[in-house]
Swiss-Prot record:
The chain crosses the membrane at residues 17-37, 57-77, 89-109, 121-141, 174-194, 200-220, 235-255. This is Phosphatidylglycerol--prolipoprotein diacylglyceryl transferase. Keywords: Cell inner membrane, Cell membrane, Membrane, Transferase, Transmembrane, Transmembrane helix. It is found in: Cell inner membrane. The gene is lgt. Its EC number is 2.5.1.145.
């Protein structure tokens, strides 16, 4: 049996300014996004993306993550609490972010970015999908440090007691999610995106991969208390929100392989691909790739 180390959530205290581990984990995730993105761009200098565009992606993405993630947490999990404590809506540094809300926020943000640069939306989402999982994993480490989102009671040897909760051994579900949504998911997306595939396939695989990993991890995670934490049929809110992702991912993969031209890992279509994409490119302008 293990005991949670009860790490101080404040990493650095500079007078009245407190830098929390949770915020540092988000910064680590954004740093991984930039480093991996730069690596992919340098490997494909003739591709659709540049370093300056990557900086814009990060800016748009951060806004999408923070706004969407916070609103998702409020409406999906703790609506009643924030209705009674509206000022705490803005205390994002204390934790309380929803992946599914952040995902919707990023989707909207990338649509705006694609429009700005005259790119196909799926080309943008295919590019960023492999850059995201390590950030998700970093966020789960932040959850573990904060001693939040703990697991369900268990009798496994590695069960962990969270003193802030009770004295019952529980699954360290934050670490499970770090391994699944962070490391395993990153490996899957990085390898898959490096192979020839049609436009939209990487985005579809992202939806399926995250949905499956998250749904599996939810069996070990204590359902969130409050508004819509546990839904019908014994399925948690996280699982209900992941099911549409999996379905949409399957549909997107089938659509991509049936209608889109094969594209190499460097973003170059073959002869058949160029012909198949000519109509799409003509509709969106000569700059769209």
């Amino acid at each position: 049996m293990l005991v949670h180390p009860q790490i101080d959530p404040i990493a650095i205290q500079l007078g009245p300014l407190a830098v929390r581990w949770y915020g540092l984990m988000y910064l680590l995730g954004f740093a991984c996004f930039i480093l991996l993105g730069r690596y992919r761009i340098k490997r494909n200098p003739e591709g659709a993306f540049t370093i300056s565009m990557l900086d814009d992606m990060l800016f748009y993405g951060v806004l999408g993550v923070i706004v969407g993630g916070r609103l998702g947490h409020i409406f999906f999990y703790q609506f009643g609490y924030y209705l009674e404590h509206p000022l705490e809506i803005f205390a994002v540094w204390q934790g309380g972010m929803s992946f599914h809300g952040g995902f919707l926020g990023v989707i909207a943000a990338m649509a705006l970015l694609a429009r700005k640069y005259h790119l196909r939306w799926l080309v943008v989402t295919d590019f960023i999908a492999p850059l995201v999982p390590l950030g998700l994993g970093a966020g789960r480490i932040g959850n573990f440090i904060n001693a939040e989102l703990w697991g369900r009671p268990t009798d496994v040897p590695w069960g962990m007691i969270f003193p802030y909760v009770d004295n019952i051994p529980r699954h360290p579900s934050q670490l499970y999610e770090f391994a699944l949504e962070g490391l395993a998911f990153f490996t899957l997306m990085w390898i898959y995106s490096a192979r020839p595939r049609p436009v939209g396939a990487v985005s579809g695989m992202f939806l399926i991969g995250y949905g499956v990993f998250r749904s599996f991890a939810e069996f070990f995670r204590e359902p969130d208390e409050g508004f819509m934490g546990m839904m019908t049929l014994g399925i948690s809110m996280g699982q209900w929100l992941s099911l549409p992702m999996i379905l949409a991912g399957v549909i997107m993969l089938v659509w991509a392989y049936r209608t889109q031209a094969p594209v190499s890992a460097r973003g170059k279509a073959g002869k058949a691909g160029k012909a198949a994409n000519a109509v799409v490119a003509g509709k969106r302008g000569s700059k769209e790739r």
